[in-house]
């Protein structure tokens, strides 16, 4: 459900805009996407875990708002991120 430190470091390194960037929308969306994928796998075995499902919905909504912000501010960065993470078809 959570992302371990080395995976998070790799995600930050892959999506950061510069070497000290840890909070840009790109990094936040990439981390949320990884957490969402992990929780989705969790629900294949634990379909009655409604407590975690609420957290999943919160993460999806947070990612949606970050993507909307990024699209409003810089469409090119938004399109590059969507392509890189494979979120939209």
Swiss-Prot record:
Q: Which UniProt keywords apply?
A: Ribonucleoprotein, Ribosomal protein, RNA-binding, rRNA-binding
Where is the region Disordered? 1-26
**One record GO biological process:** translation
Family matches, as CDD domains: Ribosomal_S15p_S13e
Q: Which proteins does it associate with, and in what oligomeric form?
A: Part of the 30S ribosomal subunit. Forms a bridge to the 50S subunit in the 70S ribosome, contacting the 23S rRNA.
Q: Mind telling me which NCBIfam families this protein's record contains?
A: S15_bact (TIGR00952)
Instruction: Describe the function of this protein.
Output: One of the primary rRNA binding proteins, it binds directly to 16S rRNA where it helps nucleate assembly of the platform of the 30S subunit by binding and bridging several RNA helices of the 16S rRNA.
- Provide the protein name: Small ribosomal subunit protein uS15
Organism from which the protein derives: Erythrobacter litoralis (strain HTCC2594)
Coding gene?
rpsO
